[in-house]
């Protein structure tokens, strides 16, 4: 195969784009930014992203997809109150919105029309922040080579959040207006108003910290799920197994946290160590059991009552 010989490209992410190919002859352009859907290889040539996402990539996308859903459920529960019977319908609607947004996002991504995406493999943290690695050969002129080296893991999250927001604005107000009769006019839409705040926050979080989240999300899941489970059981004054079994809602919350524990463990293990670390899944119920066995020594109900009385 004949390839035109040109000087090597500067910078980590500058590459040469294929201009012409005729049989075994390939002609590449000057060093610059790679087109969307391509990234540089070791020889500094822009190559299309043709690989399938790894299991860890899918788990990361699943984590980013869960964030708005969990926040929806939290604010729905927060603003619905104990007297409202509309919370369940709103929970189901939020799940439907996020599920449909995920399906639509996959369908509009390359290749279009199938529930499959092609991607470039993440090699290091700097792949998420190519804008920080634009070379300046003479320390005056900057060669701009910013592109999505982790295609499409960075932008697909923004697309998903956009569809989540659109579907929420189309479906949720009609549902809330029709069934949330137990709430006041000023309260029934507060969960929607909350989403209008946390979606921009999630967008900025992905834009600035997407690479950090990619490597840290398994540990974030484990820590947050442990903390929130302890806080929930303490606030609900659960001190023994009977308190846990007396209400179905508490069991649902417990099993949801167990699923998050398992999700975090599998994410940390990755696919290359999954078989070795599968026995760790047996530890999923351990935090809840530890809490139940030690609750009698801390007496969460007494602590809550003293806090409410200002002591």
From Swiss-Prot:
Pfam family name, one: JAMP
How is this protein positioned relative to the membrane?
Answer: Multi-pass membrane protein
Q: Which UniProt keywords apply?
A: Endoplasmic reticulum, Glycoprotein, Membrane, Transmembrane, Transmembrane helix, Ubl conjugation, Unfolded protein response
> Per the entry, what induces it?
Basal expression under nonstress conditions; expression increases transiently after endoplasmic reticulum (ER) stress.
InterPro entries on file: JAMP (IPR008485)
Q: How is this protein named in the record?
A: JNK1/MAPK8-associated membrane protein
Q: Decide whether keyword GTP-binding is in the record.
A: no
One GO term in the molecular function aspect is:
ubiquitin protein ligase binding
Task: Enumerate the transmembrane spans.
Answer: 58-78, 88-108, 150-170, 189-209, 211-231, 251-271, 278-298
What is the phylogenetic placement of the source species in the record?
Eukaryota, Metazoa, Chordata, Craniata, Vertebrata
This protein's source sits in the domain of life called Eukaryota
Q: What else is known?
A: Elevated expression in medulloblastomas. Patients with cancer had 2 to 12-fold higher frequencies of antibodies against this antigen.
Glycosylation: residue positions: 22
Q: How does it assemble?
A: Interacts with RNF5 and MAPK8, but not with MAPK9. Binding to MAPK8 occurs before and after exposure to stress, such as UV irradiation. After exposure to stress, interacts with phosphorylated MAPK8. Competes with DUSP10 for MAPK8 binding. Associates with multiple components of the proteasome and with ERAD regulatory proteins including AMFR/GP78, CANX, PSMC1, PSMC2, PSMC3/TBP1, PSMC5, PSMC6, PSMD8, SEC61-ALPHA and UFD1. Interacts with DERL1 (in the presence of misfolded protein CFTR(F508del)).
Quote the function comment for this protein.
Answer: Regulates the duration of MAPK8 activity in response to various stress stimuli. Facilitates degradation of misfolded endoplasmic reticulum (ER) proteins through the recruitment of components of the proteasome and endoplasmic reticulum-associated degradation (ERAD) system.
């Amino acid at each position: 195969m004949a390839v035109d010989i040109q000087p090597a490209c500067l910078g980590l992410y500058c590459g040469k784009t294929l201009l012409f190919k005729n049989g075994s002859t390939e002609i590449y352009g000057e060093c610059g930014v790679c087109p969307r859907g391509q990234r540089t290889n070791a020889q500094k040539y822009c190559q299309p992203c043709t690989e399938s996402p790894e299991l860890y990539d899918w788990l990361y996308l699943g984590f980013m997809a869960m964030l708005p859903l969990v926040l929806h459920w939290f604010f729905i529960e927060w603003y619905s109150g104990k007297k409202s019977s509309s919370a369940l319908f709103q929970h189901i609607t939020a799940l439907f919105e996020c599920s449909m947004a995920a399906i639509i996002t996959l369908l509009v991504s390359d290749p279009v029309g199938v529930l499959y995406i092609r991607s470039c493999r993440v090699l290091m943290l700097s792949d998420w922040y190519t804008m920080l690695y634009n070379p300046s050969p003479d320390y005056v002129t900057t060669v701009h080579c910013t592109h999505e080296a982790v295609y499409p893991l960075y932008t697909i999250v923004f697309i998903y959040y956009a569809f989540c927001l659109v579907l929420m604005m189309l479906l949720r107000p009609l549902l809330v207006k029709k069934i949330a009769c137990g709430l006041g006019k000023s309260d029934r839409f507060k969960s929607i108003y909350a989403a209008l705040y946390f979606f921009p926050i999630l967008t900025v979080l992905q834009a600035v910290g997407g690479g950090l989240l990619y490597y840290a999300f398994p540990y974030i899941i484990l820590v947050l799920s442990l903390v929130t489970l302890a806080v929930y059981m303490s606030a609900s004054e659960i001190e023994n197994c009977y308190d846990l079994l007396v209400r179905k809602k508490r069991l649902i919350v417990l099993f949801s946290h167990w699923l998050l524990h398992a999700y975090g463990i599998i994410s940390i293990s990755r696919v290359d160590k999954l078989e070795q670390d599968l026995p760790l899944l047996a530890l999923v119920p351990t935090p809840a059991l530890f809490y139940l066995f030690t609750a009698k020594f801390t007496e969460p109900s007494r602590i809550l009552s003293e806090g409410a009385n200002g002591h």
